[in-house]
Curated annotation (Swiss-Prot):
Its cofactor is [4Fe-4S] cluster. S-adenosyl-L-methionine binds at G167, E168, S197, S226, L227, H228, N302. It catalyses: adenosine(2503) in 23S rRNA + 2 reduced [2Fe-2S]-[ferredoxin] + 2 S-adenosyl-L-methionine = 2-methyladenosine(2503) in 23S rRNA + 5'-deoxyadenosine + L-methionine + 2 oxidized [2Fe-2S]-[ferredoxin] + S-adenosyl-L-homocysteine; adenosine(37) in tRNA + 2 reduced [2Fe-2S]-[ferredoxin] + 2 S-adenosyl-L-methionine = 2-methyladenosine(37) in tRNA + 5'-deoxyadenosine + L-methionine + 2 oxidized [2Fe-2S]-[ferredoxin] + S-adenosyl-L-homocysteine. It comes from Prochlorococcus marinus (strain NATL2A). This is Probable dual-specificity RNA methyltransferase RlmN. Residues 106-340 form the Radical SAM core domain.
Length: 359
């Protein structure tokens, strides 16, 4: 029988392809077209319960419910919209956890920033998510649901997906890749419009390349490595987990990934005022990028509670960028969005959890 993604003791249909759902219907003693109907209602009509799929025989719907099979949609807990129309959603899982996702609109695109885990074990000093540690990894349906929920809430088709929300995607690599397959095949978001971010996990980049090729064929999504420092000492200060992954080893693995996939790597660099944004740091970063098929994305820090890091001035950001450009580094500056509504990753979720504890 078709293996279904598991939610505790329940099975979720969200995340299955049309072919999988056709096979599922046949195994249930139904015609294969019933599987195609389920697929349409889940991915195009946004069905949230089996009972809402009125084209299915009621007897079969009731039977599926008795078996514990469900669509696997999340429940909205809270939504916040910033002045620039950036949307932040908090959604509840079957086991009472909270997932955070963000919709970032511009005139021509809608980017969904999805979470891959509930919490995060990496402990990056600038990140609100890591303050609470890791609870668990997300299932495929819980990842895909984030994109569908943003689409429904904003009444607009997402064009891009970035795995830059809560969690370390490479610690949930199989579900992330299955989610990418679903996003491309079932929701219609091209692989080139998807970015997977990682802080760097030893001995995983080659595995990612090989697994992605096995699951997706040719790798077309973008790998974004969260570098955030141009030397090992400073990187360990900002990212404690970097102590087990020397920066030279990380860059060596990135070059191997490029060889295996033919895709350039994007390096994320969060600018922390007075800490890693000086001219010498730009020079060191340019030296690291020499000979790399890569791109550097600069991000001005969004302050969070409990940390004393500062957001650099716009003039400092511009000077850092210009130094890199003058050294021949391909560089861009990410526009800050939703700063008036707890935009830093994990902030709204942490505040909500704190309120629940207080009450």
């Amino acid at each position: 029988m078709t293996k279904l993604p598991k939610l505790s003791s329940n099975s979720s249909l969200l995340g299955l392809s049309s072919e999988d759902l056709e096979e599922f219907a046949r195994q249930e003693g139904e015609k294969s077209f019933r599987g195609r109907q389920i697929h349409e209602w889940i991915y195009q009509r946004g069905a949230k319960s089996l009972d809402s799929i009125s084209v299915l025989p009621k007897k079969w719907r009731d039977s599926l419910v008795r078996k514990g099979i469900q669509i696997g949609r999340l429940d909205e807990i809270n939504r916040v919209v910033a002045e620039d129309e950036t949307l932040k959603l908090l959604m509840g899982t079957f086991d009472g956890e909270i997932v955070e996702t963000v919709g970032i609109p511009t005139d021509k695109r809608l980017t969904v920033c999805v979470s891959s885990q509930i919490g995060c074990p990496m402990g990056c000093k600038f990140c609100a998510t890591g303050k609470g540690g890791l609870n668990r990894s997300l299932d495929v349906n819980e990842i895909v649901d984030q994109v569908i929920s943003v689409r429904e809430t904003m009444n607009r088709r997402p064009t891009h997906v970035v795995f830059m929300g809560m969690g370390e995607p490479l610690l949930n690599i199989r579900n992330v890749l299955d989610s990418i397959e679903c996003l491309t095949s079932d929701i219609g978001i091209g692989q080139r419009k998807i970015t997977v971010s990682t802080v760097g996990i030893p001995n995983t980049l080659s595995d990612l390349a090989k697994l992605a090729q096995d699951r997706l064929g040719r790798v077309k999504f973008t790998l974004a490595v969260s570098l955030h420092a141009p030397n090992q000492t400073l990187r360990e200060l900002i990212i404690p987990s970097a102590s087990s992954y020397p920066i030279n080893s990380l860059l060596k693995d990135c070059k191997k990934y490029i060889e295996l996939t033919g895709r350039r790597v994007s390096f994320e660099y969060i600018l922390l005022g007075g800490l890693n944004d000086k001219d010498i740091h730009a020079e060191q970063l340019a030296n690291l990028m020499r000979g790399f098929q890569s791109h550097v994305n600069l991000i001005a820090y969004n302050p969070i509670a409990e940390e004393n890091f500062k957001r650099p001035s716009q003039s400092r950001v511009n000077a850092f960028r210009e130094l890199l450009e003058n050294r021949g580094v391909a560089v861009s500056v990410r526009a800050s969005r939703g700063r008036d509504k707890d935009a830093a990753c994990g902030q709204l979720r942490r505040q909500t959890i704190d309120k629940i504890k207080i009450n």
